[in-house]
Amino acid sequence: MLRTALSRMPTLLRSVRTRDSGPRRLWDLGARLKTAERLRGWAWGWASGWRSSSSAPGSGRAAALGRVEADHYQLVYTCKVCGTRSSKRISKLAYHQGVVIVTCPGCQNHHIIADNLSWFSDLKGKRNIEEILAARGEEVRRVSGDGALELILEAAVPPDTPEGDEDPPNPGKMGQS
């Protein structure tokens, strides 16, 4: 009788399933969905239900499924520690609602760009780089547009202009008459 009960144990264990919606069950469900997507080439479209990933507009097989394209800022700054000028791409969502910390490529220092979650107490209520620099009397220049380009010459000296409306002499013909 004991042998009969023990021989049925694997069958009984396979039939036992958890009824909770805990993390393990969700993890298993996600793994099974990803496996099914890879095998069948299907993706879940929230608005339209199941659809083939190749029929999604503008998406190819190499495109990441379920990836949300977010708007970004292009941050260009000069490190005050080492003087390195660098550019970083930061999320607009993180800048306005989260925390943004960038690392200087020159000196490897970390610079706080935005702290909307009050992680850093030394900022005294300032939430982003615009407020931090405004408190110091410095300004932030915003450039908008897709192809925006801003060039600033730091040690600019105005060029010498000739008197009146005359054209400057041709430097290639010096001393010739």
From Swiss-Prot:
One of its GO terms (cellular component) is nucleoplasm. Keywords: Chaperone, Metal-binding, Mitochondrion, Transit peptide, Zinc, Zinc-finger. Residues 155-177 are annotated as: Disordered. Zn(2+) binds at C79, C82, C104, C107. It is found in: Mitochondrion. GO terms for biological process: chaperone-mediated protein complex assembly. A zinc finger (DNL-type) spans 68-165. Residues 1-53 form a transit peptide. GO terms for molecular function: protein folding chaperone; zinc ion binding. It comes from the Eukaryota. Oligomerizes in a concentration-dependent fashion. Interacts with HSPA9. May function as a co-chaperone towards HSPA9/mortalin which, by itself, is prone to self-aggregation. This is DNL-type zinc finger protein.
